[in-house]
C-alpha cells in the first residue's frame, strides 16, 4: 500500500516532469492548481517574469462557502480566478494541474474557469 508521504513524493516528481514542458508567458500565463485536504488554491503565473498575476483560494475573503475541501468549493475558486484574470485582461492560459489527476476537484476548478471565460 502506498503511504501518503510516498503519494506526495510521486506527485512532486510528476509535477517536476510536467513543468519542464509547461511554461507560462505574458501572452499565455500558466494556471497552477494546488490542492490540500482542506483547501484548494489557484494561481495565474507569468514564468518569464516569475510573477504571480492573479490568485484565488478557499481562504479568500470573497469565498463564502462553509466547506472548503469539496468540488463545490473548487468550482467557486475556478470562477473567482477566472473573474480576476479577465479583469486583468488575461483570456488565454496554459493549465498546470500540479501533478494531480485531472479528476474531481482539479477538473471542477478547470471546468468552472472555462465556463467563466478563460480559454485553455
Swiss-Prot record:
Keyword rRNA-binding recorded: yes
Pfam families assigned to the protein according to its UniProt record, in alphabetical order: Ribosomal_L18p
Regions annotated as coiled coil: none
Keywords per UniProt: Ribonucleoprotein, Ribosomal protein, RNA-binding, rRNA-binding
UniProt GO BP: translation
Gene Ontology terms for molecular function: 5S rRNA binding; structural constituent of ribosome
A GO cellular component annotation in the UniProt record: cytosolic large ribosomal subunit
Family, as annotated: Belongs to the universal ribosomal protein uL18 family.
Function: This is one of the proteins that bind and probably mediate the attachment of the 5S RNA into the large ribosomal subunit, where it forms part of the central protuberance.
Protein name in UniProt: Large ribosomal subunit protein uL18
Organism taxonomic ancestry: Bacteria, Bacillati, Bacillota, Bacilli, Bacillales
